[in-house]
Amino acid sequence: MRKEGLHVLKISKRWTTKGISFLLTCFILLCPFSAFAEEPTTDYSTQSWLEAFGSLHSRISAEYAFTEWKGVDWDALGNACRAKIEQAQASDDFNAYYVALRQYGNAIPDGHVRVSNLPQVDDLYVGGGFGFSPALLSDGNVIACWVDETSDAYRAGMRAGDALIRWNGEPFTQAAQQARVEFATNSATEENAAMKRVQYIARAPVGTAATVVFEHPNDNGIYTANLTAYADQGITLQKNYPDAVVPDPIRAMILNIPYNGPKADTMVAFRLLEGNIAYIRVLGELDIDLTDTGSAPSTLAAFRAAVQQAVDANAAALILDIRNNVGGLDDMTAAMLGSFYTQKTLFEYQNVYDSATGTRSVSATEDSAGTLYIEPVEPCYTGRVIALINQKCLSCGEGLAMGIRNLENGDTLGFYGTNGSFGLAGAEATMPGGFTVSWPSGQSLGADRQIQLDSRNGVGGVAPTLRIPMTAENALKTAQGEDVELAAALAELQTKP
C-alpha cells in the first residue's frame, strides 16, 4: 500500500491464521499494497445490490487515477455490469451479483483494482482441474508442464512436456480467451494476462467435461483425451510459474486465499551463495509481526542489516530477490534503495487525489511532502546487483526494481516483467455480501512529471534487462520446483561479476 508519508500510517490490523498472528503496522487490508491516501472506507453494504453498484460506480469512475492513461470506458463498463446486477437482483442470485462485480473490476487492467475474493464462491466456477498444468512458452506454444499421474489425462497418455494443441475443438490459445480469469488478480500487462488465460482455461466447475488434443514431442503422435474436472485444491495453478518456485505467504494471508507453501518468519532473509554472492530476499516494504511477539520488527532495519552482512563479507555481487513482493510504503522503498545509491536521486513525485475538490495535485516545490528522494546511507553496497523480478512484484516492489535497474551496476532478471501497477491507492468500498472493492486514486510521477511504471496499452512495469525465455525445458524445471531464475542470476554473476 504505497503511501505518501510514513508518519501518517498509524493503523494496525491483527491477522490470525493457523495460530500465527500478523501485526500490520500499516494499512494493507484489501488495498493491494499501494499508497493509501487517508480516506475512510465507504460502506454500501446496507444498500440493495443495484444501489450499491450505482454508488460504487459513481465514485470509482470519478476517482480512478488512470482513466485517460488506460482509456477506461466507464459508461460501457457500468452499463454492462448494471444489466447483470439487475438480473441477479431480480432472481435473488448472490453468486451472479458477485461474479458481475468481479468481471467489472477485472476489466480494468490495473493490479491495484481489486474485488476481494470469496473463495467458497470462486470454487464453484474454477475449483476443478483436469489433471494437468498448461504453460505458455515464450514462442507462443503451450505445453503441459505437469500431469497428475492419478488423472484421466495421464491415463490417456498425456505426459509433462506434451504440446497442447486444441481445447474443446479450438486452438488452445484461442480457447484460452474464454478462461475465467475474473477469479484471479487483475492483470495490468498483456504479458501477465496471456499467461493467466492459459493457466485458467484448465480450471472449471467440478464435473465439467472437456476434450484436449495433445502431441508427444518424441513421436509427433496426436492424441485426444476426454476429461472431467475434479476438485484438486488448485494444484494445477500451484504447479505453474510462479507458484511452483516462489513462495507467496504474505499475499496469501493478506488476501485470505488458500496457500500450502512455505511460511515466512521474517520479511527479509539473507544468505551467502556460491562464489561469495550475497542473496537478499524482501517480501514487502512494510513491518509485520510474523512470529506473534506482539510487535512488528523494522523491515528497513532488517534490510540494512542484510546489506551490512554483504558489505562485511566483501560479497562479489548481490542478488536482490523481489519476486512476489507485495509492496508497502514508498518511504521505506526509497530508504532501502539508499543502500545502493551514492548520490541523492529523485524517487517520485506523488500526484495525490483530494476527495474534497475531486482533483489531483503535486507540489511545485522540490522538497515537498509529496516528493520522495533516494537518500544515500551507510552501509552502501556498490558492487554489481541483480534484482530478480516477476509479474507478482507489485507496487513498491516495482519501485525497488526500478531503482536497481537505474543503477549503472544494476540489472533486473526474470521470465517476466513486474506487475505494472504503481499508482497511489485511495479509498475502498464495502459491498453487500461482505466483500470490498478498492482502487488507486493517485499517480506516481517520474522526473519528467509523467506517469511512471503504470501500464498502458498492455505494457508497463519494469522489464527484465536480462530476460530468461520460458522454454519447454524451463517450464518443466519450474514445475518441479527448480529455481531457473536464481540459477541464471548466479551464472551471470559468476561469469560477469
Describe these PLM feature segments.
Residues 1-38:
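Gram-positive cell-envelope targeting signals
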Residues 36-166, 171-173, 201-220, 224-237, ...:
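Terminal targeting/pro-maturation regions of precursor/exported proteins
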Residues 89-93, 163-213, 332-334, 420-423, ...:
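PDZ domains, with a preference for the canonical peptide-binding region formed by the helix
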Residues 171, 180, 187-189, 451-466:
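A recognition module on extended beta-rich or small alphabeta surfaces enriched in W/G with H and D/E
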Residues 208-209, 213-429:
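Cleft-lining beta-strand/loop regions that shape enzyme active-site pockets
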Residues 425-451:
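C-terminal "exit" segments of structured domains
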Residues 454, 458-497:
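Low-complexity, Gly/Ser/Thr/Pro-rich intrinsically disordered linker/tail segments
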